[in-house]
Amino acid sequence: MPFRFGTQPRRFPVEGGDSSIELESGLSSSASCTGKETSPNRQLRRCPGSHCLTITDVPITVYATMRKPPAQSSKEMHPK
């Protein structure tokens, strides 16, 4: 009998902020998703599929500095 891709439903790990009550009651995470979760320190937003959390209201400079160090200029790379 050949293996069929997708015969079992995909399961995602439980993340911090996920309610175990919703998971135990049998509700799917996408059905119970409100789009926003509140935290006393910061605002969290869940993607439509409830797979990831994003922090809202963070300046773009924070994301830019988190990505990678700035590239060196051509003068620094090729000294004379």
UniProtKB/Swiss-Prot annotation:
Coiled coil segments of this chain: none
Compositionally biased spans, kind Polar residues: 33-42
InterPro entries xrefs: FAM229
Pfam families: UPF0731 (PF14982)
Residue ranges, compositional bias (Low complexity): 15-32
Region (Disordered): 1-45
PANTHER family noted in UniProt: PROTEIN FAM229A (PTHR35355), PROTEIN FAM229B (PTHR35355:SF2)
Family to which this protein belongs: Belongs to the FAM229 family.
The name this protein goes by in its record: Protein FAM229B
Organism: Mus musculus (Mouse)
Gene that encodes it: Fam229b
